[in-house]
């Protein structure tokens, strides 16, 4: 639309069309034009013959304006100049770029839109309007509607006047900004015009307050009254000129607007304010936009001057400045609230002005050992600040980078851009006990008790806030990148710097008190408040001075704190009262610097810049080191983010010295908190997602109408299955088309690029048409890779089609690329790649056709990229694998009854009479029905496992057609223990079933699969946790009429499943069944040694991933790399055969590549090189080399990823610090057979998927097959919600593992990954509607563990009770002693709260009594933490905080630091008054009781919270083992 407009803009004008030749008639009343622009350039238009033809569609489209006017004319139109309504319009310049209306003063402006009759008419065709793709030029614009109080915007061309009604969606933001300016003008007019009841003699504060009230209603454009004030002031010049234009038509008794003092004052104030501009622009005409301070130095510019045209550059600069302001205001924001005088700006406190209120300079000194706060917390991805953990800080002090004490007042209370104040702090950190500081406390600077906590130094403080309540109580908190700290008492030395802040808070609260008692807050102006404060008694805590001037000075210099208190006050009338307007105005008048408030997401600086870091005995381990990479990984990521070489030493140095601040989400590299109500991963939920289930339908090809010579080249090679002759080559218009090559075809959609198809075979049809059958070659940018794809790489798909050779547009330069793979070929392939890149660049420079290549098959329905089936493609045999896949899918979707009517096929499964089957639980009613509950991590009521039945017979229906409605199936139901009672389920084996006489007839579509049911004595020897086999046992009979269980009667002889593998049976001992004690200690058969892969575990943690893979019999973790000492020690304790490197992986990779003689291929920092050189010879000797490592797995830390959405071409240095680059470089250098990446689920979606895409692109460039998916650990046998993203990579000749089947019911939806073109992929189905086994509950998991008290630290204990549940028996194994059943100590207040939380499901802080309690030290505290009720509405009621677990529910996501006020606040034992123990958390993750953890209790919780649940790792390992066996099978042998 805009492009067409740009073309139309260049047409020349000819005499006006006939529509102008009308008789003179009386003119209708036109709106008064204010500040209308009239002096413009001329531009001609030309009426072409084509305009006489109108194509009728849903809305008529014409190219010429006069035709649109003629088609929309009404019989009632009598005016000599037409007026029309204008909808769906865009205003743009001659280049087709959308422009604000005021740019008419600089450029020619044209219009595109739907022209409608001037009034609503009954003619439906005319009321639809006529779209004119480009018309104008716009001659001038005007605003009317002043008397009505609602602005009407008019634009005029030479032919007509247009009432602008509704802009196009793409133009709405631009137009809405201008409309709000018009609204402001009308609002000011109504307040000043006597004819409208206004008063031209009011003051500026009163005028602004009135305008705020007027504009607050009916507009979502402004987030607060303060934002409206800022906007009105900024547009003072515009408003003045609009009202000045009304003087010509003003009534005699009306005042001249140009002489109204308040309007002149508004204009002057507008010319003085700072209008921030973030950057200088140099437009094509050479105009340079100055910073605001520079503009302010020159004389104020008015619209009058602009109209005169005396200074085009200035005029253009001011209009561009206004456009910048619009863009700044329209930045998207979440949960915006009025946080200062404006949501756009924060006025900086001037240190010189407040210096007299503070003591003389002093410096921070301490003899205490302090720990870097970044060691205590982890953070990953972007997160809103309210989701950070909350702590208390006692005995604290704040200082700058020189350790000089500094006031908190100098730091903005909102997160802002370009802050030039660096404030750090130190103190004693404890858990947040919810305590407040009383304003009546006479000694706020002394510590009444010695806090029991850790001495820490903080990273840079980013913002702070004040909270206050009744009874003169106040709380002040500060935020760093990793936590919120509620401030307790400061240190004695810092107390003098603290008192002014508290005093200002008291003053603000006192002013609020003044206003609350007034019947109308508008009665108190700034002067009134100043007078009242000066009249306070000297003993009043808000007393400043008896001198009003001193009070005014204090209010203004400390005004930003007071404005913040008003901004968060819940009463809108108070927020925009005259006092606030007056104070904000006085702050503006002092010309304070403004900071722009930015989006509130947290950013982590890996290097703590606190000056204490260099002196602290506990050095920070969080120092960021640029990732060590191979050149291949460095190139892929570097080219994406930067155009310069990251290996340039000058730029590398600059990057190392620069700040490394990126946004991230709270948590750590592994930890992720699940939120309720999440239904997927995609951020854009407007379009309906389409899940990939089968290959796409072929694209619609545009047939060719041209005539070209087409003939076969060569003889026929054979025939298709239909007897049609096959050919190898054909000449199409002189171009050779060959089987195995590629051709381009035009598609119906003109916006799409030509489709490229791989030629499978060519044939001549029976009607003598020359045909081609091809498979679609997908461009990389249209796959999940997006912009990370190589523009020359195509991917074969399973989408195929047949078309005529005459439809071919051209022949593509294309090759199937196959290169030798393995670490020994890396250098050879690098050389070949360089030559290929050079050739491609040369062709691009010469504008030659692109040479495409294909290495992989892309299968979105399988979620991955696979090796090309080279033996099956391009054979010219008339056979197509894609067609076969489609035929198989069609067969799977149909039902087929066998001839004997004893079996049938459905969904690809063959069922026969006497088979044991799964039945959808919704198809068979349960004994007890329940409903799901809504509290966090609640009960599993309503979640039911599949019903196990035996197929007895097939019941035909009257219909003879074999479809879903032609027959039913009769089945016998087996009951599960949970069908009887919760107690029975708890004490029974999860694989146990009960025989019954109940039968039911069901449709075959109710069946979900097959399973086996055996006698208990026939169960396999290698039973293991977690379950991966569909095998059950049955020894008991359930009488549903009596609800009783008994041994199977002799007359009941169920026909159990036939056992095909006798090696899985237990060895019988006489006639009796093996005892339970003996069965528990039988060890599973050890898997063959040759199948275990030599594994390198990177970012190994305590070893959860390695443990599960090892248990699956597929991995031998010979090497592990872990940065944290306690975690590395835990890994070593549980994997004594492994060589564990407790070091930075960047250093280890550098050392390995040096050992292999490949340091030239290594991109690393000087620091990494030096540390690698310091490794001992013994350490170096144990380093693995390429060829020794078969499998690499790990979960790289994620901090900093989310910051990439802010990266530009100069931000490559920030990306280099990401550990995923090093992780991928290990894969590139070693080229193992298999590679597994694990991460939090948002890894695939944050940063618009760029990191995920680059990871896939890197692995594909190495030559790997790749697949991706998200799994829920709760569906694999743990009682915990933990969603994790995985990426498998396999060497080209290997088999990619499938995703493990979820075995347990768990209440989560499908976990989808966004692909492209609105498609989504889910690795596995959701088990919310059924699975083979029931969910594991909290009681199943920890019900047998002995009671412990709050703070119990005894590491070794006895079990005291026997294991009851199936899970408990499996998790205990042969362990005799219970270890790590220890819990964190809560402080006295939280312990009291815990004891008051009821021991019932769903109980949390909402159940606390609303009263106070006196602690042992005499302090009086509220039972309900103060911050929860005040902020509950914004945080889903803080559901789960101080929450108890439910015996029948599941655990929330395991975190590294369980606490009642943490991100996962549900951490109280279901019955005992304490936080969960280390062992209980370990069990929730599926760690066996024999697993050991290292370090103190915080280290152990951290190790567990960061770990991959071993049962999930086991399930992945089983599928890897299957893939290894599958490779050895005959069908996969070359």
From Swiss-Prot:
Residues 1-33, 321-341, 647-717 are annotated as: Disordered. It holds the Pfam family DNA_methylase. Changing residue 1300 to S: In met1-1/ddm2-1; reduced activity. It is found in: Nucleus. Changing residue 1465 to E: In met1-7; reduced activity. Residues 328-341 have a biased composition (Polar residues). PROSITE patterns: BAH (PS51038), C5_MTASE_1 (PS00094), C5_MTASE_2 (PS00095), SAM_MT_C5 (PS51679). One of its GO terms (biological process) is DNA methylation-dependent constitutive heterochromatin formation. Its EC number is 2.1.1.37. Residues 735-869, 909-1049 form the BAH domain. It catalyses: a 2'-deoxycytidine in DNA + S-adenosyl-L-methionine = a 5-methyl-2'-deoxycytidine in DNA + S-adenosyl-L-homocysteine + H(+). Signal peptide: none annotated. It comes from the Eukaryota. Belongs to the class I-like SAM-binding methyltransferase superfamily. C5-methyltransferase family. Maintains chromatin CpG methylation that plays a role in genomic imprinting, regulation of embryogenesis and seed viability. Required for proper patterns of CG DNA methylation in dividing cells. Required for MEA promoter methylation in seeds. This is DNA (cytosine-5)-methyltransferase 1. It comes from Arabidopsis thaliana (Mouse-ear cress). The lineage of its organism: Eukaryota, Viridiplantae, Streptophyta, Embryophyta, Tracheophyta.
